[in-house]
C-alpha cells in the first residue's frame, strides 16, 4: 500500500512539474521577447543658443516685409478642391524662396500654421498652407501616399506662382506630417529643402511603443505595466485597419538628400527627440548629405512654449520662427554644411527617457484578434470544464446507483431460488 502511495505521489509531482514547464514555456513564447529600455546615447549639444546664422550669406530677417494673404483653391485630381492660404512678402525682390506646409495629426485647416507662415513671409519667404482632407481619415486609418500626392499638387501650385523661385522651394512638416513629407521627397527630386518638426522618424509601432512607455511612466504606472503596455504595440492591428502602425519610415528616410532642419521641443515625451535627430543625421550622411541642422527649443510637441499637449493659445517657443527663417534663407542662398557660423546641434538640453526599440516582433500571440480570442476563451473554457466536471460527477453517481441496484437485485434473486 505504501509503495503504491509513494508511486502515485511521485507521478503527480512529475506530472505537475512537466505541466508547469510546458505552460511556462508556452507563456514565455506568447509574449514578445523585447523591452523598452532607457535611452543612454544622448546627443551632444554644442550651444544653448538656438540662433541659426549663415557665415557668408546676407539674408533678410523676420519683420523685414509686410505680408499679403491670398485665398487659393487646390484641385486634388479626383474631383475634390481644397482651400489654401498663400502668404507673400510685399515688395520683396523676386524670385523668392517658398515653403509648403504639411499638416500633422492635430491640424488640417488652411488657417493653421498662420503665425509661423506669416512670420516666414515677413522674412521674404512665400508660404502656402493647404487644407488636409479628412475624409477617410480616422483614428485607425490614414492614407499617407494619398496625402503625399495631394501635397504634391499644392507644391506644383506654389512652384508655379509668379515671384517664386521653383529651385528654392521646399517643405515644412510637423509630427505625422513628416512621414508624408518623406514620401514626397522619395517621389520628387525638385524639393530644395525640408524642415522636419517633432518627427517620429521610426516605424509606427517602434515610435508608439516608446511613446506609450513614456506616457505610462509619467502617469506613475508600475514598471511591469509600463513594459507590458509597450508590448501591445507588437501586435498585428491590420484586421482593425490600423495599418499605419506598420508605416515603413526607413524606406523613405533615405530620400532626405536635400538640406534638412530638424526641430524638437524638449518637453515632448511622445517623440524620440534625441534618437530621432541622430537617426536623421546618420541616414542623411549615408546618402551623402551632411547639411543637416538640429535645434531644440523649450517647447512642447507643437513647438509651443508650454508642456501641455494640444493646449490652446500658447505662444511659439522663443526663437523658433527666427531659426526657421534664417535657415531657409541661408540654404536657399547656397549655404552648405560647412557654411554656417552656428553649430550643427544646439538649443535647450533634451532628455529622451526611453529608446525607440527597433525590434518589436510579437510572440505566438501575434494579433489583437488572437489576444481577444484568448481572453474570451479563458472564461468559456472554465465554464465548459465546470459543466464537464458536473456531468462526469453525475454520470459516475448514476453508474454507482445502477451498480448498487443490480447488486441488490442479484442478491434477491439468489435468495428467491429454491434449494
Language model segments and positions:
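Short beta-strand element of the alpha/beta-hydrolase
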Residues: 94-104
